[in-house]
Regions:
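Flexible cofactor-recognition loop at the NAD(P)H-binding site
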Residues: 11, 59-61, 88
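A glycine-rich helix->loop->beta "capping" turn
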Residues: 45-56, 80
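Adenosine-cofactor binding site in Rossmann-like domains, unifying the SAM/SAH pocket
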Residues: 26-46, 59-66
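Short, hydrophobic beta-strand segments that form beta-sheet elements in well-ordered domains
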Residues: 4-6, 24-32, 107
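Structural signature of the Rossmann-like NAD(P)-dependent dehydrogenase/reductase core
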Residues: 6-7, 55-57, 81-87
Length: 118
């Protein structure tokens, strides 16, 4: 049974992903509600190391990009999957969403860079 790790799994899209993947996969959710701080990259990487799919959903400024690079480095050359969750906020950035949108754009660009290396 494939093992899927999802950050930000307790609400919104994260909760929907848990519901969907739980049908056929073992799901591990990481969020503040169960004591995980995605800013602690080492703790997250310990949970992700033995899984098959990592869904990088939770937002915390730089942490999503740092997690992408850390998991990619750990999994390089292995048959594993990383899914990064972006946002429509990156299109037509509104003032109140600028910090969020900028970090999601950074994640998107980091994703493209990692994809080019595969």
């Amino acid at each position: 049974m494939p093992r899927v790790v999802i950050t930000g799994h307790t609400s919104g899209l994260g909760a929907a992903l848990v519901e969907r993947f739980s049908v056929s996969d073992e799901v591990v959710g990481l969020s503040r509600s169960n004591g995980f701080d995605i800013r602690n990259i080492n703790d997250v990487c310990e949970k992700v190391e033995d899984c098959d799919v990592f869904i990088n959903n939770a937002y915390d400024r730089y942490s999503q990009v740092d997690l992408l690079y850390s998991v990619y480095d750990m999994w390089k050359g292995k048959d594993k999957k990383i899914i990064n969750i972006g946002s429509l906020a990156t299109f037509g950035i509104r003032d109140e969403l600028k910090p969020y949108a900028i970090h999601k754009i950074a994640l998107q660009e980091a994703h493209y860079q990692v994809a080019k290396q595969l």
